[in-house]
Design a protein with these regions (language model features):
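Small/aliphatic-rich secondary-structure junction motif
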Residues: 1-51
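A short acidic, glycine-rich active-site loop
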Residues: 51-66
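Glycine-rich, Arg-bearing micro-motifs that act as flexible, cationic patches
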Residues: 9, 106-128, 146-147
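Short, acidic/small-residue loops that bind anionic groups at enzyme active sites
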Residues: 131-142
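Short secondary-structure boundary segments
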Residues: 35, 110-112, 142
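Conserved beta-strand positions in the Rossmann-like core of class I SAM-dependent methyltransferases
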Residues: 32, 83, 138
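Structural beta-alpha unit
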Residues: 73-107, 144-147
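Short, hinge-like loop/turn segments at secondary-structure boundaries
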Residues: 48-52, 101-103, 125-126
Length: 147
């Protein structure tokens, strides 16, 4: 069995990983820890050139990849087969593409609340994954966790 665990490096990420670890151990599953990084900007600001933007984006991607590696190291130390994947793009679409590519059996995601107005306009990651209807989705409630 394969679990795809979506993380965004916010405060509740540790809780989401703890739940994923318990699930992986009880199901004898491997874990793919996935973060969907921001897609390329549509335009470059007037004050910064493309090289500056590319350099900053590259630095952020390296930092995000290091964080993913730390998470997978922690899971491996707990006896879970874990790998890290950093993708770029719209979060829901990127996660669905990775679930397909990796042959995921279950997606684990946090229930980050953005507030009612933002959620009405933008929707939520968990809702988007559930609406896709192709994989079971475990939503970890994180409302009372510190961000």
């Amino acid at each position: 069995m394969k679990l795809l665990v979506a993380v965004d490096f916010s405060g509740p990420t540790d809780l989401i990983l703890r739940v994923a670890r318990r699930l992986a151990k009880s199901l004898d599953a491997s874990v793919w820890v996935v973060h969907a990084a921001e897609p390329d900007p549509d335009f470059v600001g007037y004050d910064t050139g493309p090289e500056v933007v590319r350099g900053q984006v590259a630095k952020e991607l390296r930092e995000e990849h290091r964080s993913l590696q730390r998470y997978t190291d922690q899971l491996r130390e707990a006896g879970v087969d874990a790998k890290a994947i950093l993708v770029r793009g719209s979060t829901v679409e990127a996660l669905l593409a990775m679930a397909e590519k990796q042959g995921a059996d279950l997606i684990v995601v946090g229930s980050h609340g953005r507030g009612m107005v933002a959620e009405m306009i933008l929707g939520s990651i968990s809702q988007g994954l559930i609406r896709a209807g192709r994989w079971p989705v475990t939503v970890v409630p994180v409302k009372n966790q510190k961000e």
